[in-house]
Every structure is written in structure tokens, then in C-alpha cells.
């Protein structure tokens, strides 16, 4: 088991954990000269039915954790884009894209509704962000990282 806000070194692998806004932790993994970020359940889980007090705390907590990634060059990131959140689906992804340098971003937690990716790309007018977001079409899709742009 791992706990939030810790650094673990296992051989040539370094793992830093961030506190989730839901369950578990997010991971920043460095190995073989590459950096991989996996958000887990770290997201700005804004919801209509919970009120501004809880939503405000959620947003502050999310931003606080993401600020810990500033200055990191991330090669591959897995970031939440959950269509169950309706109009708030992309709040976490949008903040991540504006504040973290990541070469390739794979949206996740989409519950097989991959249309949220294209909706975000159409909504976002900054191609520096949208060009880094990978289009996912199906569950368990395989990407050949050696042949990406």
C-alpha cells in the first residue's frame, strides 16, 4: 500500500503520490527517462446536487494537488474526463491542460462514452491543448507510443 504525498523508490523507478479528491492516490512515476502521471480518482468532481461549499472545497483541493505537478515534464498522462458530471465533465482536464506540461494526455473514467473527448476539443479553442489529447474510440484500445508524433 502507498499513502498520499510520499515518494517511493523501487530500483530504477520513482513513484510520487498525490492525495486524491475521492479514493486512493494519484501517481507520478519516473522510470527509464520517462514520466507517467495517472490521476486515479484525483479530479474536480463538481456536481449539481452537493452545493457550493462542497464543490468549492473539491476545486481547491484538486487545484492544490495539480499545482504539485507544475514544473514536471510528463510524457504520458491519464486524466479524468467523466461524462457523468454533465456540464462539469471537463473541469479537471481543462485545469490540468493549462497548468501541466504533458506530451500525451489520455482521458479516462469515461464509462465507454468517448464522445466527451471530441466535445472538449470542440469547446476548447487552444490547439496547444487539444492536439495533445489522445482520441480514444473503444475500451482497451492500444496505442503504439513509438509511432506517435
Where does each model-flagged region fall?
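Core dinuclear metal-dependent hydrolase active-site scaffold
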Residues: 1-73, 138-149
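Binuclear metal-ion centers of metallo-dependent hydrolases, dominated by the metallo-beta-lactamase
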Residues: 1-7, 89-149
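A sequence-composition feature that detects small, non-aromatic residues
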Residues: 23-26, 39, 77, 94, ...
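Active-site environment of divalent metal-dependent phosphoester hydrolases
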Residues: 23-25, 44-48, 83-89, 108-118
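Active-site neighborhood of phospho(di)ester-bond hydrolases with catalytic His/Asp-centered motifs
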Residues: 37-41, 57, 76-84, 104-111, ...
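A short, acidic, amphipathic alpha-helical segment used as a generic capping/interface helix at domain edges
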Residues: 61-67, 86-95
